């Protein structure tokens, strides 16, 4: 009996040593980096993936899985093996798409590594548009409900939610149009849409080129890249909404691997090349690890659920 116990404990110790060694050696092969959107998400995602490849010593390979306001990408990562070899390039959409009914789970169905950067969501119109302030646009929208068109990235996306918060907060009832990023900007210029809610850095180029103008931004503070543009809160809308980007993995990924990913993410985000590129794009670099990001997600999720409930678009998860 004593011999059997010795063999069992010996086997357990050997297995533990093997597992510890495997974690220590991670990563031993390329890592899939799942990107849920095109446009700015794709640009930023490929940049951080490349920077992380250098830190980890293995290829971090961008893979586009676009659709459902991030639902396809997050579902894919949720269902992946929890070994750290499949990473989601998350954004605020991890909170919006999970609360609007695009997926049957909430944001806690994945493990979250941390945040890389954040940016405000601007309300954009053509430079030729008749509105020069957000109030002018919203006053017309209230006077003519279901007439003015506002384009956004897709149902459940961060731009969708920012648009809902803004219009609902000012009693505006527009026609909301789900449109891809590049097409959204073309439609602004052609007049096919009256306005758009968008990521920050791409339309900022159009503003500087004199083709578009921002009427407001969603964040709690003015952005130094566009200091003359008021926040929605300054204009009387009770909202603070940032588009963040970071990393998530399958639930149950070993803590040792998550810690390695966090360290690699922060080191890559802080690298001279990546941080310089972010500065050039006017994106706020704001890396944070698992604990700080968990607190941010919890607070942001409460805010988003409140926005959705007020707008009547919140979808509770079915109890198991």
Residue ranges and their predicted role:
Residues 28-30, 168-172, 255-320:
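An extracytoplasmic/periplasmic, membrane-proximal ligand-sensing/linker region
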Residues 25, 52-54, 76-85, 98-183, ...:
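Hinge/capping helix and adjacent helix->loop/strand transition within the periplasmic-binding protein
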Residues 118, 202-270, 299-302, 316-320:
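C-terminal lobe and pocket-closing loops
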Residues 23-109, 147, 159, 167-195, ...:
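N-terminal (or domain-start) structured segment
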Residues 1-9:
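Bacterial N-terminal signal peptides that target proteins for export
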Residues 36-40, 92, 126-131, 152-157, ...:
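Short coil/turn segments
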Residues 14-23:
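C-terminal segment of classical bacterial N-terminal signal peptides
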């Amino acid at each position: 009996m004593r011999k059997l116990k010795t063999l069992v404990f010996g086997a357990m110790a050997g297995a533990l040593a093997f597992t510890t060694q495997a974690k220590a050696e991670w990563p031993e092969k390329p890592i899939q980096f799942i990107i849920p959107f095109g446009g700015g998400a794709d640009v930023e995602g490929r940049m951080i993936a490349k920077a992380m490849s250098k830190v980890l010593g293995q290829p971090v390979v961008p893979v586009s899985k676009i659709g459902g306001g991030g639902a396809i990408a997050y579902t894919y990562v949720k269902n992946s093996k929890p070994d750290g070899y499949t990473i989601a390039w998350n954004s605020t959409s991890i909170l919006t798409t999970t609360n609007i009914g695009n997926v049957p789970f909430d944001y806690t169905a994945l493990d979250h590594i941390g945040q890389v950067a954040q940016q405000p969501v601007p309300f954009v119109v053509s430079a030729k548009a008749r509105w020069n302030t957000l109030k002018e646009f919203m006053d017309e929208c209230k006077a003519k409900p279901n007439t003015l068109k506002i384009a956004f990235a897709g149902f459940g996306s961060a731009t969708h939610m920012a648009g809902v918060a803004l219009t609902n907060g000012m009693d505006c009832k527009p026609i909301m149009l789900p449109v891809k990023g590049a097409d959204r900007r073309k439609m602004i210029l052609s007049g096919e849409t009256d306005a758009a809610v968008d990521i920050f850095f791409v339309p900022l180029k159009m503003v500087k080129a004199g083709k578009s103008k921002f009427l407001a931004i969603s964040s709690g503070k003015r952005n130094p890249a566009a200091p003359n543009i008021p926040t929605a809160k300054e204009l009387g809308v009770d909202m603070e909404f940032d588009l963040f980007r970071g990393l998530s993995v399958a639930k149950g990924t070993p803590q040792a691997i998550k810690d390695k990913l966090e360290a690699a993410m922060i080191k890559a985000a802080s690298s001279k090349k990546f941080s310089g590129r972010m500065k050039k794009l006017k994106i706020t670099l704001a890396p944070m690890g698992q604990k700080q990001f968990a607190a941010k997600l919890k607070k942001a999720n409460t805010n988003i659920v409140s926005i959705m409930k007020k707008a009547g678009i919140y979808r509770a998860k079915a109890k198991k």
